[in-house]
Swiss-Prot record:
Keyword Metal-binding: yes
Name under which the protein is recorded: Phospholipase A2 isozymes PA3A/PA3B/PA5
Homology family: Belongs to the phospholipase A2 family. Group III subfamily.
Domain of life according to the entry: Eukaryota
Catalytic reactions of this protein: a 1,2-diacyl-sn-glycero-3-phosphocholine + H2O = a 1-acyl-sn-glycero-3-phosphocholine + a fatty acid + H(+)
Family matches, as Pfam families: Phospholip_A2_2
Tissues of expression: Expressed by the venom gland.
Disulphide bridges, residue numbers: C11-C33, C32-C72, C39-C65
Length: 143
């Protein structure tokens, strides 16, 4: 199956929850992931949406969702939250997107060449801002 962070049901590829209310033992971190999974504006892997094809192996989200996700995890000042944040933003470096007025394709021919485009909100990729670990180290100092 897909990789899900131990102690969570929503952190990782897909989710392992049977319904929205179900959370893992790392409840606070899991809530951040669940909220991010329910972001309104996203483009799944290889999907064409907002005038752009997502060539990443995972879903990319609107930057508002990724910024909320980062803040949610950082507020917890917790090792598990830091691990999830560092994996998503620093290791996988999953970008987010902003929408800008631009020209997007709306119709293609058999060879996948654009035959009709129009002015519409078009997705522009934004590099993931780094995640700063927030948990206290064993000596009591921040990392």
């Amino acid at each position: 199956g897909a990789f899900i962070m131990p102690g969570t049901l929503w952190c990782g590829a897909g989710n392992a929850a049977s319904d929205y209310s179900q959370l893992g033992t790392e409840k606070d971190t899991d809530m951040c992931c669940r909220d991010h999974d329910h972001c309104e504006n996203w483009i799944s892997a290889l999907e064409y949406k907002h005038g752009m094809r997502n060539y990443y192996p995972s879903t990319i989200s609107h930057c508002d969702c990724d910024n909320q996700f980062r803040s949610c995890l950082m507020k917890l000042k917790d090792g598990t939250a830091d691990y999830v944040g560092q994996t998503y933003f620093n290791v996988l470096k999953i970008p987010c997107f902003e929408l800008e007025e631009g020209e997007g394709c709306v119709d293609w021919n058999f060879w996948l060449e654009c035959t009709e485009s129009k002015i519409m909100p078009v997705a522009k990729l934004v590099s993931a801002a780094p995640y700063q670990a927030q948990a206290e180290t064993q000596s009591g100092e921040g990392r």
